């Protein structure tokens, strides 16, 4: 029988906008956040509360970002997260949030109510950030309550020059699945750090960080947007 995972029922009919953290506002993150904005509008048209997104990125817009990422010359020197979210909010009339810092927040691990969201989306180009994130998230695997701070899924983007992958896994230990005579429901999907042996990957190979010309030699101009479209297409079919 074909294996299938049914989306957590809570996300299909929540009493609040589904909370999403987008970590990284670069080539992929800027495309993903824009796609999520369009998805939120579509969900609201169908009677769903939509999405509330917070974008995290400590970097500022540089000349190397213009062209490969969704930034313009007028945004040079601005926080990537703030520039991206401000543009989305103005266009769609949202009140999404921008954080010019890394996630997880340093204080989160020690706070009684850590900063969490229903869906965590990572769009970073380094391994260490993924490992640090998982050390934080796995502490919340047994989180069973349903509210805007309940962590349920982690989706990770990764790409090389002309290829990439999008992998979604459970933060929550197990997700209740319906009985099916046609499929084999899977209550738990591995996250990226459980699927990939990062100890075998060299950090220098995890993504480009250079001028636009050099970046285009290492990474196809449209690989980020291809991955972002794949993600939003997947999420749309889940909801």
Language model regions located:
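N-terminal charged helix/coil linker that caps or initiates catalytic domains
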Residues: 1-20, 41-46
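Alpha-helix termini
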Residues: 11, 39-50, 137-149
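Glycine-rich adenosine-cofactor-binding loop
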Residues: 19-41, 57
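Glycine-rich phosphate-binding loop and adjoining beta1-alpha1-beta2 segment
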Residues: 52-92
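A structured beta-alpha segment of the ubiquitous adenosine-cofactor-binding alpha/beta core
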Residues: 79-117, 124-128
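E1/E1-like adenylate-forming module used to activate ubiquitin-like modifiers
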Residues: 118-227
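Conserved small/polar residues in nucleotide/adenosyl-binding loops
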Residues: 232-239
């Amino acid at each position: 029988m074909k294996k299938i995972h049914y989306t957590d029922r809570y996300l299909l009919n929540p009493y609040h906008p589904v909370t999403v953290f987008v970590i990284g506002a670069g080539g992929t993150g800027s495309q993903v956040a824009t796609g999520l904005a369009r998805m939120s509008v579509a969900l609201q048209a169908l009677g769903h509360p939509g999405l509330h997104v917070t974008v995290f990125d400590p970097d500022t817009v540089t000349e190397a970002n213009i062209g490969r990422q969704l930034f313009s010359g007028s945004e040079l020197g601005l926080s990537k997260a703030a520039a991206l979210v401000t543009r989305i909010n103005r266009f769609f009339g949202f009140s999404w949030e921008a954080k010019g810092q890394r996630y997880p927040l340093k204080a989160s691990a020690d706070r009684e109510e850590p900063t969490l969201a229903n869906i965590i989306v990572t769009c970073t180009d380094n391994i260490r950030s993924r490992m640090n994130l998982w050390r934080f998230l796995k502490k919340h695997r047994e989180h069973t309550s349903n509210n805007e701070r309940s962590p349920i899924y982690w989706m990770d983007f990764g790409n090389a020059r002309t290829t990439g992958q999008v992998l979604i896994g459970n933060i929550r230990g197990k997700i209740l699945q319906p009985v099916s005579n046609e499929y084999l429901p899977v209550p738990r999907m591995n996250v990226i750090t459980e699927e990939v042996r990062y100890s075998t990957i060299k950090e220098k190979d995890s993504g480009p960080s250079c001028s636009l010309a050099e970046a285009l030699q290492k990474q196809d101009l449209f690989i980020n947007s291809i991955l972002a479209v794949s993600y939003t297409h997947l999420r749309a079919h889940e909801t």
